[in-house]
Amino acid sequence: MKTLVLAIVAVFTAICSFNSSPDLKAEFERKGDISGYAETVVYSEELPKFYADENGDFTVLQFTDTHFTTMMSLNDRFLLQKMKDQTIEYAPDLVVMTGDMIDDGNDGKFNKAYVLRTVAEMFEDLEQYWAFVPGNNDGVNYGASADVVAYLSQYEHCLVADEKNISGGCQYSIDIYDGSELTHSMLFIDTMGYDKEDPDYIYGYVLPDQVQWCENEINTKKAENENVYVSVFLHENTPDFFRAAKKGESYKWYYPQVTSQLEKYDIPKNQPLDDVFRASGSVGLLSMGHKHPATAECSFYEGIYYHVTPQTVLASTLITIHTDADNTKSMYDFESIYM
């Protein structure tokens, strides 16, 4: 009840602001268009180091596929308030949003800039660090994925960076240390939006220069610590998610495996990414959104966890990384946090 009341108050406050602000009205008329933002904003690629706790643990709270449209609706505000409540309750070391934070822009009251600003300001108020990777919807209209990343980069607690001269809206890594030693790293990869050049307008795929960046980044981490492991956060799946659905084993007996429904989402052109991850011997987790399952899904396949978080309107996932584990199977705990 408290969450609903707070959401109603937030909607009322937003409407009052709208009615009293000509600038906000004009922004809504433009649908919050941020096109070209990436060309006018220079943002730092320096990201803070993180540290595991005394037990070697690091926690990630993963949200995905919120599909916010306006922040003037009760649905949007209720979901945002639930995210805030969970962030406060579980106090993760890092929040990760794996794409489709914003809908495609076809809603009549859509305002891209207002949504981005509202989400970012919530995390600023909480002083909560969070990482973001784009999904296939974030860059469809009124600003590309690179514009979204540039807009969010203005906020101190939003950890986004874009490697120069690499395709996509962002590619970056965040390192976890145990004292002075690099003990784990997290990679964040833009799996690209819809491929508008394709006659069927299907999902895009990770391009060769992005794949090469991933390989180089993992090798850089291994040069610092040959025993380092890597977790990967992305929006869309690689073909090994489908193989994990067919041949993998369940994380826990009560935790659903990745389903073969992924076959209809299969993106064969993402195979080079799987090849790099498998050849490295250092990747322990791929965690995605996109698929909108009814519950979280997880399969362990050939040394790697393949995890799918449901839409945040249903649940988030609390991931505990045991950075001092000596094998990938015992390195992770997953917990569904229902809304």
Model-derived regions: residue spans:
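N-terminal active-site segment of His-dependent metallophosphoesterases
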Residues: P22-A113, T118
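Bacterial Sec-dependent signal peptides at the C-terminal "C-region" and cleavage site
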Residues: I8, F12-A26
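Metal-dependent catalytic neighborhoods of phosphoester/phosphodiester hydrolases
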Residues: S73-N75, G99-E121, G139-C158, A244, ...
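His/acidic metal-ligating clusters that form di-metal
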Residues: Y90-D93, S185-F188, D200-T295
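Active-site-proximal beta-strand elements of phosphoester/diester hydrolases
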Residues: D57-T70, T183-G193, F233, Y305-Q311
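Binuclear metal-dependent phosphoesterase catalytic core
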Residues: L24-V41, L47-K49, S173-G179, L273-S280, ...
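Active-site environment of divalent metal-dependent phosphoester hydrolases
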Residues: T69-M72, D103-N106, F132-A144, Y194-E197, ...
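Extended active-site neighborhood of metal-dependent phosphoesterases/phosphodiesterases
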Residues: L24-K49, Y114-N225, S316-L318
